C-alpha cells in the first residue's frame, strides 16, 4: 500500500514539474495549453478514486491523497504546505462522495466515472476560487477550464482508475483485499462458463 501511495506522490511531482516548464507563445497556443493542463489535472486526483476502488473503506481516498501529497512535498513543490494538503483532502472527500451515497457497496465503472466527475468539479471550483481569481466564471477561459476539469476527471480519475484497478487486481497483487478477490472470482466464473 505504501509503495503505491509513494508512487502516486512521485507521479504528482513529475506531472507538476512538466506542466510548469512548458513555454508557449500566441493566444491560441495559450488557450489550448490551458485546456490541456486542466485535463491533465486528473492525474493529481485519480489516486482518490483508485484508493476507494481498492480499499473500499470510508476515508481511504482522503488518506491516500494526504500521504501522496506528503511524498510530493518531500520531493519538493512550489506550492505551500497548507495549499497542497487542503486541496488533497478536498479531492479525497469528493472522490468518496458517490461511494458514500451507496454506503460503499457499489463499485463499478459508472461509479468510478461519477467519482472522477465530482472530483473534477470540486477541483475546477477550487482553482477558480484560489488560483484563477482573475478569470471570470462565464468567460471563455472559465468555461474551458471547467469543461476541461470535468473531462479530465471523468476520463483520467474515473475511466483510467477503473481500468488500472482491474489490471492490478488481475495480477493477483490485490488478493488480500476484497476488491482484488472480487475481480479474480469474476474472471474465474467467466472462464468456466460454457460457450453457447
Language-model features, listed with the residues they occupy:
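Membrane-embedded alpha-helical hairpins and interfacial helices in multi-pass inner-membrane proteins
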Residues: 26-30, 104-196
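Generic transmembrane alpha-helix motif of multi-pass integral membrane proteins
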Residues: 42-61, 94-99
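Aromatic-anchored segments of alpha-helical transmembrane domains
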Residues: 9-17, 66-75, 116-127
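Interfacial aromatic-anchored transmembrane helix boundaries in multi-pass membrane proteins
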Residues: 69-97, 130
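Hydrophobic transmembrane alpha-helices
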Residues: 1-53
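Membrane-helix interfacial "entry" motifs
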Residues: 1, 33, 37, 53, ...
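Alpha-helical transmembrane segments of integral membrane proteins
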Residues: 3-8, 40, 44, 59-64, ...
Amino acid at each position: 500500500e505504501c509503495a503505491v501511495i509513494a508512487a502516486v506522490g512521485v507521479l504528482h511531482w513529475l506531472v507538476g514539474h512538466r506542466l510548469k516548464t512548458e513555454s508557449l507563445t500566441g493566444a491560441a497556443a495559450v488557450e489550448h495549453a490551458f485546456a490541456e493542463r486542466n485535463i491533465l489535472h486528473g492525474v493529481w486526483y485519480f489516486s482518490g478514486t483508485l484508493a476507494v476502488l481498492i480499499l473500499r473503506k470510508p476515508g481511504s481516498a482522503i488518506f491516500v491523497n494526504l500521504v501522496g501529497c506528503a511524498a510530493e512535498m518531500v520531493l519538493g513543490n512550489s506550492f505551500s504546505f497548507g495549499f497542497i494538503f487542503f486541496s488533497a483532502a478536498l479531492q479525497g472527500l469528493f472522490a468518496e462522495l458517490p461511494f458514500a451515497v451507496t454506503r460503499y457497496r457499489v463499485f463499478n465503472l459508472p461509479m468510478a466515472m461519477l467519482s472522477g466527475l465530482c472530483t473534477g468539479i470540486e477541483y475546477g471550483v477550487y482553482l477558480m476560487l484560489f488560483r484563477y481569481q482573475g478569470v471570470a466564471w462565464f468567460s471563455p477561459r472559465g468555461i474551458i477550464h471547467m469543461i476541461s476539469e470535468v473531462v479530465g476527471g471523468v476520463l483520467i480519475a474515473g475511466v483510467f482508475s477503473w481500468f488500472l484497478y482491474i489490471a492490478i487486481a488481475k495480477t493477483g497483487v490485490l488478493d488480500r483485499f476484497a476488491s482484488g478477490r472480487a475481480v479474480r472470482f469474476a474472471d474465474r466464473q467467466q472462464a468456466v462458463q460454457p460457450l453457447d
